[in-house]
Amino acid sequence: MAWLQIRLNSTDKYAEQISDFLEEIGAVSVTFMDSQDTPIFEPLPGETRLWGNTDVMGLFDAETDMQAVVSALITSGLVTADFAHKVEQIEDKDWEREWMDNFHPMQFGQRLWICPSWREVPDEKAVNIMLDPGLAFGTGTHPTTALCLQWLDGLDLTGKTVIDFGCGSGILAISALKLGAKQAIGIDIDPQAILASQNNAAANGVADRLQLFLAKDQPQALQADVVVANILAGPLKELAPNIMTLVKPQGYLGLSGILATQAQSVCQAYAAVFKLDPVVEKEEWCRITGIKQ
């Protein structure tokens, strides 16, 4: 069976409204694609994080009158009368199987593997974490997550306490626990991130050693041997006083979510308190690490 697809460009402001409208008039699915190869982080549960310039693609049954779809879009006021678009025929595929085939176990450092649940674990003796990829949470596919996982794998976490600041899916906290940490603490501003972390920790058998807090409920005088924060450069600089107090004396700090061009300004925010290591880059992103003096 073939399908008909309409593809049009939008801004992030209107993309979701266009998506909702296409579904209302019969689209069997709507997907978003980056129009300009702009970096974007893996969104949290319930969040649709869109690019500033987004292509919206609506898939319709082959019998659909696509001119009527175009006319309805114009009438809705969501697009201009002369909006650029493309209609094409799409051959049927097993879309779910094709999506699943794109994901394989990924190794980070020497010991750590992140595995989708439908894949066989490559090394039973390795530190294996089961997380399914999708829009709901980060699974290590983003370079900044990979940089943090590699760093954690290289530390001796035995008996240590780790704080995952901006925990999202909990992937970093869970990895730390599987790598030998005694306890991990996840902090995030989004209640859905807390829920995702709880579920993922339970699936990996470490829920009893993971404490989770919304940032507004973060305990006073909280400190850990290791603190990792994979958020954006702006918040890393703005929240530097708070993040620095979370690290015990002689403790370790790992920061990512930083473009390589932003590394110097982030380093300046922490250099007075930490002896910083050389910046590590991956693609256009980087990781900053150091020891509290």
Swiss-Prot record:
NCBIfam families attached to this UniProt entry: prmA
Annotated protein name in UniProt: Ribosomal protein L11 methyltransferase
Chief location category: cytoplasm
Residues reported in the UniProt entry to bind S-adenosyl-L-methionine: 145, 166, 188, 230
Classification via Pfam families: PrmA
Subcellular location: Cytoplasm
Substrates-to-products reaction catalysed: L-lysyl-[protein] + 3 S-adenosyl-L-methionine = N(6),N(6),N(6)-trimethyl-L-lysyl-[protein] + 3 S-adenosyl-L-homocysteine + 3 H(+)
Family: Belongs to the methyltransferase superfamily. PrmA family.
Physiological role: Methylates ribosomal protein L11.
Top-level taxon of the source organism: Bacteria
Gene transcribed to yield this protein: prmA
PANTHER family, per the entry: ELECTRON TRANSFER FLAVOPROTEIN BETA SUBUNIT LYSINE METHYLTRANSFERASE
Top-level EC class: transferase
Any one of the GO BP annotations: methylation
GO (cellular component) term, any one: cytosol
Lineage: Bacteria, Pseudomonadati, Pseudomonadota, Gammaproteobacteria, Pasteurellales
Keywords: Cytoplasm, Methyltransferase, S-adenosyl-L-methionine, Transferase
Enzyme Commission identifier(s): 2.1.1.-
One Gene Ontology molecular-function label: protein-lysine N-methyltransferase activity
